[in-house]
C-alpha cells in the first residue's frame, strides 16, 4: 500500500482536485487529509464529505501548525494505523496525472532503495521544474549567508521588487531559470544527495520506521526540506530524485486566499523564512557542540549516475 498525506488549509476545491487525481492512480492506496485548522470550516466540510469513504481519512488538527508539524500529524497517523510501503507527502495544490505513479515508486525502490524520493515537479505557475531545489545541502555558513540576504529583502523597495517578480509568471520564470543555470541543475537525470522540493516528497517505510515525524518541528513554513536534507546527511540516509515520476504543482493557492496582497504575502514568506533559518542555525550549532573532538563532518553524497 501507498499512503498519501495531504496538508489542507482553506482551499477546499484544490484539495478535492488533489484527492481526485490520487484516486485515479493505479495501485493500492489510502489518502490522509490533515486540516490545519482552516478558519473557513472547510476541514469539517471535508470530514463530512469523505465520512463514508474507506479510502480517505480526514484528521481535524486543532491549530494551524504550519508545514512541518502539520504534515508530521499525518505521517504519524500513517505509521500508527497503516502498513504503508511508501508515504507520499504532498501539498493540496499538487496533482498527479501519471497513472502508474505508484508502481513506478516501487520499481525505483527495487532498483535503488531510498529513504526519501522526489519526483519531477513542474510548476504550472511558471513552467519551471522545481526539484531538485539545489545540488548541495546547507551548512552553517550557507544558512547565515541566506539569512543575511533574506533580511535585506525586508527593505520596502526590495520587497516591492520581489513581490512584482512573484506576481508575474514570465518574470518569475526568468529569475528561476537564471538561478538554476548557475547551479547546473539537470532535472532530466536521476540524482542522489540533492535537496528535494517539499511540495511532493516520498518516504520509504524504513525511514518512517525510524522517524515517524520526519519534518523538523521548530519551523512554521519554508526551508523544511533543507533542514530535512541536513538531518538525512547526518545519518547517511539515501535521498534520491527521479524524473521518471512527475507531478504538477499549482503554486500559491492557499497563501493567495490568506493574503490577497502580494506585498503582504511576500512579507509573510520572509518572516517565516527568517524564523526557519534561525531554527536551522540553532540545530547545526547544537550538533557541532555535541560532536566528539576530531570527528569529521558528513559530506554531501555525490550526484548519482542515471
Predicted region positions:
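A conserved acidic beta->alpha catalytic loop
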Residues: 12, 21, 35-44, 63
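A short, conserved alpha-helix in the catalytic core of glycosyltransferases
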Residues: 186-187, 194-213, 218-243
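A recurrent flexible, glycine/aromatic-enriched loop bordering the glycosyltransferase active site
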Residues: 155-169, 182-203
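Glycine-rich, basic loop-to-helix element that forms the pyrophosphate-binding segment
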Residues: 61-81
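Short beta-strand-to-loop acidic/aromatic patch adjacent to the donor-nucleotide binding site
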Residues: 83-95
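Short, acidic, metal-binding catalytic loop of nucleotide-sugar glycosyltransferases
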Residues: 20-29
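Conserved donor NDP-sugar-binding/catalytic core segment of glycosyltransferases
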Residues: 95-133, 138
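N-proximal low-complexity "stem/linker" segments adjacent to membrane-targeting elements
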Residues: 1-21
Amino acid at each position: 500500500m501507498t499512503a498519501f498525506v495531504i496538508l489542507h488549509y482553506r482551499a477546499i476545491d484544490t484539495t478535492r482536485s488533489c484527492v481526485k487525481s490520487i484516486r485515479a492512480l493505479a495501485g493500492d492506496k489510502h489518502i490522509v487529509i490533515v486540516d490545519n485548522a482552516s478558519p473557513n470550516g472547510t476541514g469539517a466540510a471535508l470530514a463530512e464529505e469523505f465520512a463514508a469513504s474507506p479510502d480517505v481519512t480526514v484528521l481535524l488538527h486543532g491549530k494551524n501548525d504550519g508545514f512541518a508539524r502539520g504534515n508530521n500529524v499525518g505521517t504519524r497517523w500513517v505509521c500508527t494505523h497503516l502498513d504503508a510501503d511508501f508515504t507520499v507527502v504532498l501539498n493540496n495544490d499538487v496533482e498527479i496525472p501519471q497513472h502508474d505513479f505508484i508502481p513506478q515508486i516501487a520499481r525505483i525502490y527495487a532498483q535503488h532503495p531510498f529513504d526519501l524520493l522526489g519526483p519531477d515537479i513542474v510548476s504550472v505557475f511558471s513552467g519551471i521544474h522545481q526539484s531538485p531545489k539545489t545540488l548541495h545541502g546547507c551548512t552553517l555558513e550557507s544558512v547565515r549567508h541566506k539569512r543575511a540576504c533574506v533580511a535585506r529583502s525586508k527593505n520596502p523597495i526590495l520587497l516591492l521588487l520581489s513581490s512584482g517578480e512573484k506576481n508575474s509568471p514570465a518574470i518569475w520564470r526568468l529569475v528561476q531559470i537564471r538561478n538554476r543555470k548557475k547551479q547546473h541543475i539537470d532535472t532530466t537525470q536521476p540524482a542522489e544527495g540533492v535537496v528535494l522540493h517539499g511540495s511532493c516528497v516520498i518516504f520509504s517505510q524504513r525511514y518512517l520506521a525510524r522517524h515517524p515525524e520526519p519534518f523538523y518541528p521548530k519551523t512554521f513554513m519554508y526551508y523544511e526540506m533543507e533542514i530535512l536534507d541536513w538531518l538525512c546527511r547526518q545519518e547517511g540516509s539515501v535521498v534520491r530524485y527521479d524524473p521518471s515520476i512527475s507531478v504538477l504543482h499549482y503554486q500559491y493557492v492557499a497563501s493567495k486566499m490568506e493574503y490577497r496582497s502580494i506585498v503582504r504575502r511576500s512579507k509573510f514568506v520572509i518572516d517565516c523564512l527568517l524564523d526557519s533559518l534561525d531554527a536551522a542555525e540553532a540545530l547545526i550549532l547544537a550538533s557541532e557542540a555535541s560532536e566528539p573532538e576530531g570527528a569529521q563532518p558528513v559530506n554531501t553524497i555525490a550526484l548519482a549516475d542515471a
